[in-house]
């Protein structure tokens, strides 16, 4: 939260909080949700300044105010509000979302003849109402996805309300809303399907390759860590009920990518990564997903000494061994970025066979020394 407050305009965190509160209290009216949102935004801004005592006091005040308004917000609040002051906050955070009985179509936002009049009167307020209604009627969508839809709808309103026939133009709205849902559903199926088909190890390698080509300048350990954490996110989230998978994945990837962007912000590895990190919070995950191969990468001169085929690959925990082996693959790709998928597959399989053989051998190092020439022959045949 503090990273979002620091790195993006105020309206981003306000919008994110509005979505989260709207989804939590799905039956609550806009004005009540707005009050809670404003208080949560204010307390987080203060908490991020580092005053722990003031932060705790404001958090307790906020929970008091939520409990005072419990009848307006949610029927599920009674149990949490009956707890002690210290127990209330964790209880509220763990509270399941209140389902809304609102239609997902939200036709009043694009079929009403006064849409453009109302939008022009107060654009921010109109969009806040839309965001509130969209979020509470789409509980299966992540907060980031809801913000993307809201941003897309804003763009449509700007275009249509400036046109001569705005009613005709606004007929694109349901197409836009449906496309957003279709995209995230396809992404969910694609990733969970690939994980199920490939298994942890090969899905991890696939992600490693995919992100290497997006950001080939990143160091091997950083790339291996990123792909590994993404794979663990997929394993956890794809194990949940289908309607929870997308929200789970996007929220966890949002934290992961935020951490990476924080580390990279002083010297971004390339312009594409910089663009994804700083241009739009709502579109950050989508931006990284959509990134294509970085076109301006210049590979270093071939140097086989960077490929550490030795007994170290068999030492340490299983996780440590996997990381070291994947780092060798990244170093290979850095020097041979133009190898195609078939060549990559051939190299991975050859490396895997030698690794299994040598780590099972009595003398690991002698085995690697004996096998290295044959592996390098496969690697360099490009």
Swiss-Prot record:
**Which superkingdom, per the lineage?**
Eukaryota
- Show the InterPro entries listed in the entry: ALB/AFP/VDB (IPR000264), Serum_albumin-like (IPR020858), Serum_albumin_CS (IPR020857), Serum_albumin_N (IPR014760)
SS bonds (residue pairs): 2-48, 47-55, 67-81, 80-91, 116-161, 160-169, 192-238, 237-248, 261-277, 276-287, 314-359, 358-367
Ranges for the Albumin domain?
Answer: 1-178, 179-377
Q: Which PROSITE patterns match?
A: ALBUMIN_1 (PS00212), ALBUMIN_2 (PS51438)
PANTHER family this protein is in?
AFAMIN, SERUM ALBUMIN-RELATED
Q: What is this protein called?
A: Albumin
Source organism per UniProt: Aquarana catesbeiana (American bullfrog)
